[in-house]
Design a protein with these regions (language model features):
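Gram-negative (and chloroplast) outer-membrane scaffold detector with strong preference
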Residues: 70-149, 158-176, 203-205
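Short glycine/proline- and aromatic-enriched beta-strand/turn motifs that initiate or cap beta-hairpins
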Residues: 19-87
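Residues that define the transmembrane beta-barrel architecture of outer-membrane proteins
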Residues: 23, 61-65, 111-115, 130, ...
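Outer-membrane beta-barrel "beta-signal"
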Residues: 31, 234-246
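Membrane-embedded beta-strand positions of outer-membrane beta-barrel proteins
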Residues: 25-29, 69, 81-83, 119, ...
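Cleavable N-terminal export/targeting peptides
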Residues: 1-24
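Transmembrane beta-strands of outer-membrane beta-barrel pores
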Residues: 29-35, 85-89, 123, 138-144, ...
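Flexible, solvent-exposed loop segments that connect beta-strands
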Residues: 37-57, 89-110, 140-156, 188, ...
């Protein structure tokens, strides 16, 4: 009986090792069709707009590029790494005092370049076709605001830490995967989140490098409520892209 139990344990460990990837690299690039909405009311003149007044989004769609890469390694103590980039474009109007100059419905452009640095751990690694990752996202946002009517331009960089959760399910006997990830932080009054859900299809005719297609929906929300700033801005829409798995 002892030999049988030992054999079963060894077989289970070997099966788990066979199902888990010791090392893996994945990357993707595509376009996100963004629909912005909301407004920003502030008396904080130290921000990117240096504004005592209100900015309101014109809610005009735009297509912006995104890129991501996932690096998984076999060292248990060290976290795996996921890196992401996306740009966000928002056009609207500003009313108030900007850098000491009074404006009314002044056309305003805000561009945000986002770099996400995500160390994470595999809690489940394709165990029963399910993957679960937990980690921390450091979202670096480089913002630039431009009001052409008063020849005003300003930029700012902030870092937002968020909890990162990703789950994935491989549909058996197909090359289809369903995946979602959430980046989230709140202090009760203010909340920031970045949520994605997608379906992808892997083309497995190449053994070493496997191309894939992904289609999904993404929503970012910035709901800030403090003494001098009330922000309610949202960016959402469908995205699609190409992937490579090594």
């Amino acid at each position: 009986m002892k030999k049988i139990l030992t054999s079963l344990v060894c077989m289970t460990m070997l099966a788990a090792t066979a199902n888990a990837d010791l090392a893996r690299v994945e990357m993707g690039v595509g376009s996100w069709q963004q629909t912005p909405s909301g407004s920003l009311e502030t008396s904080d003149t130290s921000g990117v707009l240096s504004l005592d007044g209100t900015y309101t989004s014109a809610e005009e769609d735009s297509s912006e590029m995104y890129f991501w890469v996932l690096i998984k390694h076999p060292i248990p103590v060290l976290p795996n790494v996921r890196l992401e980039y996306v740009s966000i474009a928002d056009e609207g109007t500003t009313t108030g005092i900007v850098n000491g100059i009074g404006v009314t419905d002044a056309e305003t452009t805000i561009d945000m370049k986002q770099f996400d640095i995500i160390p994470y751990y595999n809690i489940l690694d394709n165990t029963g076709w399910v993957t679960l990752d937990l980690g921390l996202d450091l979202k670096v946002i480089q913002s630039e605001a431009d009001i052409s009517s008063i020849h005003y331009s300003s930029d700012d960089t902030i870092v937002i830490p968020l909890i990162y959760v990703r789950t994935r399910v491989e549909i058996p006997a197909t090359n289809i995967g369903v995946e979602a990830d959430v980046k989230y932080i709140t202090d009760g009054d203010s909340t920031v989140y970045d949520i994605r859900a997608k379906v992808d299809y892997t083309l497995d005719f190449i053994p070493v490098i496997q191309p894939a297609l992904e289609v999904g929906y993404r929503i970012q929300k910035y709901d800030i409520d403090d003494s001098d700033t009330k922000m309610d801005l949202e960016y959402s829409g469908v995205y699609a892209g190409l992937m490579l798995r090594f």
